[in-house]
């Protein structure tokens, strides 16, 4: 299940949100890779590669959230556009609980062995958290990024 897909356009490289969109693409690609590996783990294969991908995903997500927190959201909230401020405030409010949920997920699955011991539980929880994050990225791209790009 592809969680976020998008066609690259020449305009994207000129947008203020280009690097955030690229990070979304990278996170989506890692999601797809994890989903592929998950099939093998559910069939009894080692979860080592899957746990490594999850660690990569976690690292990229942390960098992405930090960049948004330090640059994107302050810019959006500090701009003069009331619509942009409203959208940014709503999205920023939601990110804390989402990040906490993801951290709890990581703590519950600290190793390949824990994944291998309960692959079905892991699969259900992974699918749920990835869907939640994908929906969040889609909202940013549909609601926030066009408003930020319009400031340019």
Question: What kind of feature is each model-predicted range?
Answer:
Residues 1-152:
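Small-residue-biased structural context
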């Amino acid at each position: 299940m592809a969680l976020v897909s998008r066609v690259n356009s020449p305009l994207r490289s000129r947008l203020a949100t280009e690097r955030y969109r690229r990070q979304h693409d990278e996170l989506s690609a890692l999601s797809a890779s994890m989903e592929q590996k998950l099939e093998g783990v559910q069939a009894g294969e080692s979860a080592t590669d899957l746990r490594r991908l999850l660690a990569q995903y976690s690292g990229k997500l942390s960098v992405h959230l930090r960049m948004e927190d330090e640059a994107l959201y302050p810019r959006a909230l500090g701009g003069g556009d009331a619509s942009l401020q409203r959208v940014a405030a709503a999205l920023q409010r939601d990110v804390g609980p989402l990040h906490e949920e993801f951290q709890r997920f990581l703590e519950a699955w600290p190793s390949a062995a824990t994944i291998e011991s309960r692959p079905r539980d892991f699969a259900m929880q992974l699918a749920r958290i990835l869907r939640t994050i994908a929906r969040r990225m889609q909202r940013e791209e549909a609601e926030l990024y066009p408003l930020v790009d319009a400031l340019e």
